[in-house]
């Protein structure tokens, strides 16, 4: 099946109601059907391919990708696909300063690691019941917000965002730090300042699954390429 047909089958072309449009998305709109803007997939297909290729190249060069999708219908998909390809993710709430104040965030990640170790080795059980419950609540709270980035080990090289409107703070932080931004941009969104714009439906579960699967597959393919290059380098060094 062609990429265009795949996109049509999962509803990537359905935008928002005409009343909610952002005029800056005009060049990506094909027309209107029953009061809903229809996205021009002839524009979306090459832009999506460019974005997927960029993600793959970034990973092949040893870079890190952070997937961001905190809206209800994106949360589980973003988490599952990010885990499948071994990349970091934010799927519950974007903590202000998650990128721009990463030093402080890193301290919270260290705290989470310490508490998890205490839980694993039984240290928590030696505390009073009140202290133990407080620490367990802290673990749950930190895990919910930071669990997806605790293995990131530094700032990402790029972020991939589902819904540029909802994740505008994440995008602003990435822009401030010169981190590349890949984003699904619906007809009600502002495409300004996004490095890799993907005009498309950011609400339908099938569309979100489609994007995330393609990105995760690109990461996995690139990791295989990266390992193959490393293996060749090792062989050359031993020769």
Curated annotation (Swiss-Prot):
InterPro entries referenced in this protein's UniProt entry, alphabetically: Ribosomal_uS2, Ribosomal_uS2_bac/mit/plastid, Ribosomal_uS2_flav_dom_sf
Domain of life, source organism: Bacteria
GO cellular component: cytosolic small ribosomal subunit
One Gene Ontology term from the biological process aspect of the record: translation
Molecular function GO terms recorded: structural constituent of ribosome
CDD domains: RPS2
Alphabetical keyword list: Ribonucleoprotein, Ribosomal protein
KW Protease (keyword) present: no
Assigned protein family: Belongs to the universal ribosomal protein uS2 family.
HAMAP family: Ribosomal_uS2_B
Alphabetical list of PANTHER family matching this protein: 30S RIBOSOMAL PROTEIN S2 PROKARYOTIC AND ORGANELLAR, SMALL RIBOSOMAL SUBUNIT PROTEIN US2M
The protein, known as: Small ribosomal subunit protein uS2
Organism of provenance: Francisella tularensis subsp. tularensis (strain SCHU S4 / Schu 4)
């Amino acid at each position: 099946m062609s990429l265009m047909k795949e996109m049509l089958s999962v509803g990537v072309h359905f935008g928002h109601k005409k009343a909610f449009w952002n005029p800056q998305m005009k060049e990506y709109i094909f027309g209107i059907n029953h009061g809903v803007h229809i996205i021009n997939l002839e524009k979306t297909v090459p832009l999506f391919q460019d974005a997927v290729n960029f993600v793959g190249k970034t990973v092949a060069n040893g870079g890190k990708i952070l997937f961001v999708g905190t809206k209800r219908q994106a949360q589980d998909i973003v988490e599952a696909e990010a885990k499948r390809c071994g990349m970091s993710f934010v799927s519950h709430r974007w903590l202000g300063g998650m990128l721009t104040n990463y030093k402080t965030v890193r301290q919270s990640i260290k705290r989470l690691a310490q508490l998890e170790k205490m839980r694993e080795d039984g240290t928590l059980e030696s505390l009073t019941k009140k202290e133990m419950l407080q620490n367990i609540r802290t673990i749950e709270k930190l895990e919910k917000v930071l669990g997806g980035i605790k293995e990131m080990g530094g700032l990402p090289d790029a972020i991939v965002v589902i819904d540029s409107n909802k994740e505008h703070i994440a995008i602003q932080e990435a822009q401030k730090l010169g981190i590349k931004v890949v984003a699904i941009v619906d007809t009600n969104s502002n495409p300004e300042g996004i490095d890799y714009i993907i005009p498309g439906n950011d609400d339908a579960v099938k569309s979100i699954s489609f994007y995330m699967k393609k990105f995760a597959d690109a990461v996995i393919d690139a990791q295989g390429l990266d390992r193959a290059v490393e293996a060749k380098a090792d062989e050359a060094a031993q020769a």
